Structures are given as structure tokens and as C-alpha cells.
Amino acid sequence: MATILVDVVSAEASIFSGQAKFVALPGESGELGILPGHTPLITRIQPGAVRIEKEDGSEEFVFVAGGILEVQPKHVTVLADTAIRGGDLDEAKAQEAKRAAEELMQNQSSDLDLARAQSELAVAAAQLAAIARLRRKK
């Protein structure tokens, strides 16, 4: 079966690099599905789970807090603002981040504070959704 090279990187490290049969991730306009031979594409991605179906049929999950996706017919590159392997996600930390963002929204003193709080809340909610999705897979 045809495969595509997938690289998921953040400023801190390379999180995943390998061949895959399929990649799904959250785009600005909804979920994107990438197969080998996909038309070239560059787009922004939203916070959420990147699902990589590897050659052997197993799945790898990586949480991204947004970033850029570049697709070429034989190569997919995810340049993530922040990327965390699915197994390394910390539910307690995500719950605390969500609570802190909600509190910041209640106590915001400017439009900038509100925008930052909304962004932090979106990332925390996406992390919690990714954790829930991983639990369903197990």
C-alpha cells in the first residue's frame, strides 16, 4: 500500500517522523484527511489531535496547539506551535489550564487579556478532547 512521509515538529523537538497510510488533523475549516498523493497544500491548523495511521495499521496521536501544515504528494510536515505525544498528555494539567483561562476571562481588564484567555481556553479544551479521544481508543 502507498505511504506518505509524515514529520511532526515543534520548536522544542521532532515529535514524530515516519511513513503513514493516512493523517487526520484539525484545520481552520474543519478536519483534514491526508492520503498519499494528496494535492499540495499549505494551511493553518487548529489546536487538537493529529491522528497518524502508520504502515502497520497502528495509530499514533500527537496533540498540537496550532501551527502550519504543509502537504506535498509524498510528504506531510506539521510545524506545530507546541506538540505533545498523546501518551504524554497530562489531564490534571489541562484541567488546571482550563480553569485558569476561565478565571482570566472573568477578570480580564482589556481586549488583549480576553483574547489571550480565549486562546488558552481553546488549547486546554482541545487537550482535554484529545485525552478523551485517546481513552476511547484504548
Swiss-Prot record:
Q: Which GO terms describe its molecular function?
A: ATP binding; proton-transporting ATP synthase activity, rotational mechanism
Keywords (alphabetical) are: ATP synthesis, Cell inner membrane, Cell membrane, CF(1), Hydrogen ion transport, Ion transport, Membrane, Transport
* Chief localisation class: membrane
Q: Which family does it belong to?
A: Belongs to the ATPase epsilon chain family.
The free-text function statement in the UniProt record for this protein reads:
Produces ATP from ADP in the presence of a proton gradient across the membrane.
Q: How does it assemble?
A: F-type ATPases have 2 components, CF(1) - the catalytic core - and CF(0) - the membrane proton channel. CF(1) has five subunits: alpha(3), beta(3), gamma(1), delta(1), epsilon(1). CF(0) has three main subunits: a, b and c.
Q: What is this protein called in UniProt?
A: ATP synthase epsilon chain
UniProt organism field = Cupriavidus necator (strain ATCC 17699 / DSM 428 / KCTC 22496 / NCIMB 10442 / H16 / Stanier 337) (Ralstonia eutropha)
